[in-house]
A protein has these predicted regions:
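Basic, alpha-helical helix-turn-helix
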Residues: 15, 62-63
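C-terminal regulatory/oligomerization modules of transcriptional regulators
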Residues: 1-2, 9, 21-35, 40, ...
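Short alpha-helical elements of helix-turn-helix
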Residues: 4, 10-16
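Beta-hairpin "wing" of winged helix-turn-helix
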Residues: 51-62, 68-69
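Base-recognition residues in the alpha-helical recognition helix of bacterial helix-turn-helix
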Residues: 20, 44-48
Length: 111
């Protein structure tokens, strides 16, 4: 199986749409085919990528394949988002400190 990151997998609009539907609740391939403007084989390929990224898992129930969210890929996605947020907060803190220093220097120059 090819290794693909959750971020890469969600880079495709059709996969994002499928993922969002599964996020709202487990569903069958038939239900997923009904929500996107692509063929059933194309949906199956998109679902394969989501499985490879560990964002979804599949369970066979009789003749149907039911897709569920996979906590493994979601945890990786969360770690990535948290690292981005930490970078944003650090940059914000640095900018705020820089602006405070500029204001202080400006205030000293005005005296």
């Amino acid at each position: 199986m090819t290794n693909i990151s959750p971020i890469e997998a969600l880079g495709d609009p059709t996969r994002r749409q499928l993922f969002e539907r599964i996020r709202r609740g487990s569903c069958s391939v038939t239900e997923l085919v009904a929500i996107v403007p692509v063929s059933q084989p194309a949906v199956s390929q998109h679902l394969k990528v989501l499985r490879q990224a560990k964002l979804v898992r599949v369970e066979k129930q009789g003749k149907q394949r039911i897709y569920h969210l996979n906590p493994v890929g979601l945890a990786e996605l969360r770690r990535y988002a948290e690292s981005l947020w930490e970078d944003v907060l650090q940059a914000f803190g640095e900018k705020a400190e820089s602006m405070a220093n500029e204001m202080e220097e400006s205030h000293i120059d005005d005296e």
